[in-house]
Amino acid sequence: MATQCVLFTDSSMNIGGQELQALQQMRALSEAGWQTQLLCKPQSAIAKRALDIGLAVQAIRFRNAFHLPSWRAAYQIIQTQNPRAFICHGSHDAIVCALVALWVRVLHGKRIPVYRVKTFQHGYPLSFAYNYLFTKTLTPSAYLRSLFLVNKSIDPKRIEVLYPGIDFAKLANMQHALPQHIAAWLSSHPGPVIAHGAILRGEKGHSVLLHALAIVKKTQPQIRYLIAGQGQDKPFLEALIQALGLDDNVLLTGIIEHIAPLLRVSDIAVLPSLNEPLGMFQIEAQFLEVPTITSDAGGIPETIAHEQTGLMVEAGNVAQWAKAIEWVLDHPLEAKQFARAGKQQVVKQFSLEANTAQLIRLIGG
């Protein structure tokens, strides 16, 4: 079974969507008969979560890309585990594993593929790492892949799209109650509900939606907007809500651990991002058959088809956003038909099974 081992790595102390995706991939591969192990920093959030759900964890400090004790630890694990591949979700861990794998190849003539998972790209990408250090770099969208290929020196075969896998069965069976403070607010503020789950940061487009809401309120005075998330823009958004006269229309819910209860009480789900590698909220909304409106930023168009599975508007265009919201409210049957078609598409494109099958193909199963 040692030859069927896949080592996942992450050098972050925190946990977010990418780390949760790594743990989900580990569980899926384990269920498919593979041995998996997570190499990560001791006392990190991902280490705790992995242990809580019964995954194998090995602590490596990954202090930086050239941390010799981390190199030594990775080399020793290779010697004992004989892995089929590394799947690296962080920066320091990816370089450590790539360099150690190169050393193993020089010393022992054994090639160990190293796959680097990247969910962002800032600045101009340099070709050396992507052409020579990593077997392939995996991106969650074709849009993000295109940001790497602006450097014509990067081999396109080295950058591959791996759409995230979503556990739709778990989402469908999620029976958690809506947090009490949200349920109480909705009870005292009747009207159609718009839901938006995202970190409170400028590029997520909350201010665009608020300005659109001020327009919609003229004909739909009871419209409600639930903003789920936390982040640095909270004071700015609170001030904007007050300035636009939307105090009775908008609730900043804070972080919600389970998004399904929020979506189930919503009439519309929105993703007004100004920049987005892919987005997950709109995929989950479509699965739950909530009429969905998104911007056309980044990789979002890969997740929704305009006037087929939802509506898509120009990023940052307040007037278009207001018009789209009004259309959904005025055409509930057509909007619901879009949502049902959206469910079929996202299940096909973003299922856990599709993600796992592609991973197994990559690592040579």
Language model: regions and residue ranges:
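A conserved, positively charged/aromatic
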Residues: 106-142
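Short hydrophobic beta-strand element within catalytic cores of glycosyltransferases
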Residues: 39-40, 291-294, 304
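Conserved acidic donor-binding segment of nucleotide-sugar-dependent glycosyltransferases
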Residues: 306-307, 311-318, 327-333
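Carbohydrate-associated surface elements
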Residues: 143, 165
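Conserved donor-binding/catalytic core segment of Leloir-type glycosyltransferases
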Residues: 7-9, 187-204, 210-213
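Aromatic "clamp/platform" in nucleotide-sugar-dependent glycosyltransferases that forms part
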Residues: 255, 274
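A short, well-ordered alpha-helix in the C-terminal region of glycosyltransferases
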Residues: 320, 327, 334-349, 355-361
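Short His-centered aromatic/hydrophobic patch
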Residues: 88-96, 118-119
